[in-house]
Amino acid sequence: MENVRLSDIENVSRNELNSSKLDSLENGYDSFETQLNSRNNPIALDRSSWSYRIINGRHRVFLARQKGYSSIPAEFV
């Protein structure tokens, strides 16, 4: 996994996300930090465009931006 600047990743709009999944990420058994750094379910990105396209992890990317993170761990596929 690499640390990737959020400014290099495509934007995610709240209206395209599932509210219950966002709630689960924020209030679930595992902390958001644990879920963000998950090696079993990593955030996956595609490098093929000028901003990295999200393959997996849209909800986590959205919340990381909301929480003020500047970078996140991700894998490129």
Language model regions located:
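Short alpha-helix boundary/capping and kink motifs at helix termini
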Residues: M1-I55, R65
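Short active-site loop/helix that positions an aromatic residue
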Residues: R58-S71
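A short hydrophobic beta-strand segment most commonly corresponding to one strand
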Residues: P73-F76
